[in-house]
From Swiss-Prot:
Keywords: Electron transport, Membrane, Mitochondrion, Mitochondrion inner membrane, Respiratory chain, Transit peptide, Transport. Complex I is composed of 45 different subunits. This is a component of the iron-sulfur (IP) fragment of the enzyme. It is found in: Mitochondrion inner membrane. This is Probable NADH dehydrogenase [ubiquinone] iron-sulfur protein 6, mitochondrial. Its main location: mitochondrion. Belongs to the complex I NDUFS6 subunit family. GO terms for cellular component: mitochondrial inner membrane; mitochondrion; respiratory chain complex I. GO terms for biological process: mitochondrial electron transport, NADH to ubiquinone; response to xenobiotic stimulus. It comes from Caenorhabditis elegans.
């Protein structure tokens, strides 16, 4: 009995401390309009919820961690690789131990061709002129 009493007394202050960290109550969904909506950080999938969304309650206790270095932004910073006059190139992702299969990419059409697995971009300098660099192809 004494042990049960000690456990219940020790749990009381912890519950008070945890609940005292919540300072303000978010607005209800019917109070949110397009003009006053405040969105949380956008994730790599493009998800962002307004402040009244019930899915944000998991971040009341801990902070939401979002990596700003999204892979598609990092790959976009790499310039396309000039493959000279080659009509077909392959992309293996750089190292076979990374799990990237060998993907063959046809470069006959003018424009930049991206690997569907990793996003690396290639172009044929013979078929692609400067004005054609805006054309994007995705090869899966």
């Amino acid at each position: 009995m004494n042990r049960l009493l000690q456990q219940s007394v020790s749990r009381g202050p912890l519950a008070v401390r945890a609940s005292s960290t919540i300072t303000t109550k978010p607005p209800t969904p019917n109070q949110i309009t397009k003009n006053n909506a405040q969105f949380d950080k956008v994730t790599h999938t493009g998800q962002a919820w307004d402040q009244s969304d019930y899915r944000l309650q998991r971040f009341d206790i801990s902070k939401k961690s979002v990596n700003p270095n999204v892979a598609m932004h990092l790959i976009d910073q790499r310039p396309p690789e000039d493959c000279g006059d080659k009509r077909v190139v392959f992309c293996d992702g750089g190292h076979p131990a990374l799990g990237h299969p060998k993907v063959y990419i046809n470069l006959d059409k003018p424009g930049v061709h991206a690997c569907g697995y990793c996003g690396n971009r290639f172009y044929n300098s013979h078929a692609t002129k400067a004005e054609d660099m805006k054309i994007q192809h995705l090869n899966c």
